[in-house]
UniProtKB/Swiss-Prot annotation:
The keyword Nucleus applies. It is an enzyme of class 3 (hydrolase). It catalyses: ATP + H2O = ADP + phosphate + H(+). This is ATP-dependent RNA helicase dbp8.
Amino acid sequence: MAPPRPEETISEDLDESSGSSETEQPDIQTRAPKRRRLSASSDDSYVAPAPLPTLSRIKKKGAEDAKPVASAGQENPVLIRDALEIGLREEASSFSALNVAPWLVGSLTTLAVRKPTAIQKACIPEILNGKDCIGGSRTGSGKTIAFSVPMLQKWAEDPLGIFGLILTPTRELALQIFEQIKAISAPQSMKPVLITGGTDMRSQALALAGRPHVVVATPGRLADHIKSSGEDTVCGLKRVRMVVLDEADRLLSSGPGSMLPDVETCLSALPPSSERQTLLFTATVTPEVRALKNMPRAANKPPVFVTEISSESQGTVPPTLKQTYLKVPLTHREAFLHVLLSTEGNSTKPAIIFCNHTKTADLLERMLRRLSHRVTSLHSLLPQSERNANLARFRASAARILVATDVASRGLDIPSVSLVVNYDVPRNPDDYVHRVGRTARAGRSGESVTLVGQRDVQLVLAIEARVGRQMEEWSEEGVSIEGRVVRTGVLKEVGEAKREASGEIDEGRDVLGRKRNKLKKVR
């Protein structure tokens, strides 16, 4: 039988699957005995949009900048769209009230997850009732549990073959979901498998052929298996009953670097949409994702359930997040970053520094090491084993600073992070939402600092218009970043560190100064 055309595949699948979520993934350590909190209740209060900021505000700080201003007609914002229409009640304050199985309630309690968040209250009952779902909620609000709990409960009723498939855009997020699935399903001895790039395909093919219960994968690597590993390896996918697109906005986006062709290949190996549930979750519900609700559906399929928690403004950030900007000259950005990380208020904070390019991230890590910062990195130039090791070091506080590209901006849940620095201003406001969502998670406080140069003002204005709040100018009592850069010899110190780091890269050495053999990169 000829495989369905790409447009038929994605249309058939997504009409049933409408949803998305940059889910915040609870932090689960690789060490099984020490189970960490997966999620805590999130504050889903409404954040009113502010009027479009002006260029003069960026040039000169104003006291009124940080104050959000409510728009007319939004005095009674709808926090749960469609959820209230089906009778969602506030008294559903426990997982038992959501009809979650006792063994799952016990497992969540063991992991210190006792009360469902708003996205979990809205989605879990509807998914258990067999509906396709589109779920939108801010970062850190518990979207992973919102789809994993009903998947595990329905699997336990019919634990035969590959029951669920979870697709996610990054390897690190896939690993985090995989570890979380293992932790929650521990009482039932579920057999999940992780399929991502950067590791041996042969061992993955054997794992797929062994009929695991849940497959957590990145689209590119799973598509490679579907194309090249043989029918015997991937035939189990034809029994999938539930598919999840986590970070659906990224998976379904078009343009350069699009994952859509690989997603279509993955969906073509699954049963038709009329024979399975499709769940889409994201922190940024795009119009394209939202429109999937109204696509044609099979006669036997109930309507798609759509809920957007506190998403009435296009992309929301946690209300406990303090958003700031710091004006920096183009030629001294590294010096300003070094001083910012060394101030009395920031010198002990676990921090993530986001860059737009892998080469920038590599250079910054090497430079900051020479400036005595405890730093590691996460980007696509690193082999997968090193990426995993670096992330583990940061989680364990062996490194205080993680320098990363947007590969670390989606889904990763590291509760200790209290500072996010945008070294490069993201070109897409949605990327900003995901970046700053690495802090201030699950009701905790956090701060983001965006380094703004002369050419970045319009990008900052677009970000502020998107999140509905204005950034404050960064300040710390008794601290002048510019003064410290100019008067304390920082420029010379940082300049020397940058030159040494650049030379190390040119010589082909790793961050520890060891000569590195150029090996063929494993996909």
